[in-house]
Amino acid sequence: MKNFLLFLLLGISFFSFGKKPDTRYFEMRIYYCHPGRLDALLQRFSNHTTKIFEKHGMTNVGYWIPTNNTDNALYYILAYPSKADRDSSWKHFSSDPEWKTVSKKSEETGKIVAKVTSVFMNATDFSPKIKPSGGAVDQVFELRTYSQLPGRNPAILARFKD
């Protein structure tokens, strides 16, 4: 599962390559919702959470739902200038009065999230610059997992770079 998460950015095919490497610290979070609660989570993110993230210095990179969402999950990626900035942003977000109000109100009919997982990532030097598609066409993204033997990580990175 961790490898699956690690290569999310590699599977997004509509990005264009940038000239400078992206030095931001990325976090992919997966929220697994209680049955019947995914819509409440999506509404909370759409109406409140993404704006509160931005308020605390988090960059919303993207949000995805699996096409076959048997896990009732939301996948999303945030970017921060550094790990220290990430930690500070989450500390301030968690104590934000607006967030506390929104969270409490959205869970009046029951808890929304059953489990959260996170994967922390740094962009490779050949990662494309991330920019939105801006198109009206529905897009499906494929997240591939590549497993390699110990010590072979440089070889797979070279394969994608070259």
Residue spans for each PLM region:
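Sec-dependent N-terminal signal peptides
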Residues: 3-13
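Short S/T/G/P-rich N-terminal loop/turn motif that feeds into the first structured element of a domain
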Residues: 14-162
